[in-house]
């Protein structure tokens, strides 16, 4: 009967009995699998952890209430700095400590050198160092403060100038003193007031407070200084500065023929401002060395100031070279201050023979010296017609030595610029000087002579 029993059934019974015993022995809660059962190659899709699959009972998503904290795989030692680094002893300094020590020793060695330089520049006696070392910091405290500049040692002796510069400065001071000595007290005051101006403002502002204009010479070319009027009407002449610049070339060659003889001057009072005619008869002789042509228009217009100024005028008795053909004439001042001062009532600022360079140039080609007289009417500005101003006429003469002389003639009271013959017959100055036989020379001859001379002078200036 024992042999009839099936061994397979007996084995099944044994397995069941073992499983029942295990279930009885097992705790009520879920148990964690042993670490040997985890496979790191598996990954759970529910929780994302490695070691089990989504079907495994070890997944915390299935047994959420009894989820266990995952155990660490192993200890990670050596990453945390449990023993911090201790500072090295001073007996064995590293390379960085050696560099720091050298940098500290260098400024200590430079301190005495810096003190010596400071004593040399400041001139102060050396201070005794204090025992606690405070003197070194106090002596260089002002270097750290940006309140004042660094003191510079200066000697009481003046620097020695170059002999060439010293001679030049001495000549400038002597020349300035001689010019101031020859001027009137009014001009001294005006020059002293204009000394603070710039070089360009000083030239035009020297005669700003003067009642009469003057011609100042600076260098080789004379400078034309015109006094501006105090009250200028609306219809005044606007082209006067252009005319004054054009006459600058004509007045450049106006020099006395005999430099050692100075003509006597006679004071003449200024006439009242009631007269409204431009009574002028001045002779200006100039050679062919002028840079500007003779046909430069000279325009004059009268501007009546509010208060007429009365003062003496210094006028030469005879013209510079006009006495060779006619009688000497005196310049009369204008009835009012005009903007064309030097062309109507010029006061020539003449220099001494040592200062005036003698330029006596002859014409390049010889022409027959004919004593000619020709009156020409200069262009008149139409804006000044309602002021009662008359056109200015100039009489050109050719002298025996190849020079040309010009005379400023007075215009008649009525307007007749179209008839120069009647004007010459009525002018008293022309009647006195036209006694000699006159030959009329066309204006082209005058223009040709002056054009050739101006071109030759320009070439000479380029060569210099």
Curated annotation (Swiss-Prot):
Supply the InterPro entries for this chain: FAM90, Znf-CCHC_6
| Region spans: Disordered | 1-42, 69-389, 415-437
Compositional bias of kind Basic and acidic residues: 74-89, 97-114
List all Low complexity biased stretches: 180-197
Q: Which PANTHER family match?
A: FAMILY WITH SEQUENCE SIMILARITY 90 MEMBER A11, PSEUDOGENE-RELATED, PROTEIN FAM90A1
Say which family it is in.
Belongs to the FAM90 family.
How is this protein named in the record? Protein FAM90A23
Which organism does this sequence originate in? Homo sapiens (Human)
